[in-house]
């Protein structure tokens, strides 16, 4: 049931994309990565907050946010991928993105951590506002709240 909640979140996130007011990041590959972290992040956060009615005892991502080393590594992986944009071929970035971001769960853990911090510190309305504006606004808002070693580069 919790996985269904996550996947339904993707439907809502697809609608949010139509409302984004910020210009797309350049280069395009950077925008795709930020969009992916944003999408997986909010959908993972939706599932995380739904555990009271849709338990997820076997979820891989939720326990990781309680492990500072795993969270730090997820941010390092995501920042590494972002740092390679424009330096290596897009096909290689897509492979890194798949291996580290998706299979390695970095995008899920980073995005969940970001949504959780914004929601806890600034409130649900602010989280909704920045999610409705676009991924760069979301990252900038999060980075203002986060420790330096847990910030996402844009």
Model-based region annotation:
Residues 1-13:
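Short alpha-helix carrying the canonical HExxH Zn2+-binding catalytic motif
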Residues 3, 33, 37, 105-109:
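Soluble non-cytosolic domains of exported or imported proteins
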Residues 5, 40-47, 112, 128:
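Extracytoplasmic/secreted envelope proteins and their assembly/folding machinery
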Residues 7, 22-23, 28, 40, ...:
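Glutamate identity and glutamate-enriched acidic tracts
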Residues 12, 51, 119-123:
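Short alpha-helix boundary/capping elements
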Residues 15-84, 148-153:
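Post-HExxH zinc-binding segment in Zn-dependent metallohydrolases
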Residues 60-154:
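Pan-zinc metallopeptidase signature
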């Amino acid at each position: 049931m919790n996985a269904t909640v996550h996947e339904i979140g993707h439907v809502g996130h697809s609608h949010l994309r139509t409302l984004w007011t910020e210009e797309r990041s350049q280069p395009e590959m950077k925008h795709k990565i930020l969009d992916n972290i944003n999408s997986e992040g909010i959908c993972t956060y939706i599932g995380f907050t739904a555990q009271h009615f849709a338990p997820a005892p076997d979820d891989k991502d939720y326990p990781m946010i309680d492990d500072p080393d795993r969270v730090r590594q997820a941010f390092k992986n995501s920042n590494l991928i972002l740092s390679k944009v424009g330096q290596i071929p897009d096909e290689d970035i897509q492979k890194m993105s798949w291996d580290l971001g998706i299979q390695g769960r970095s995008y899920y853990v980073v995005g969940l951590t970001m949504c959780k911090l914004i929601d806890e510190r600034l409130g649900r309305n602010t989280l909704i506002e920045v999610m409705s504006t676009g991924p760069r606004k979301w990252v900038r808002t999060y980075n203002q709240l986060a420790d330096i070693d847990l910030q996402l580069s844009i």
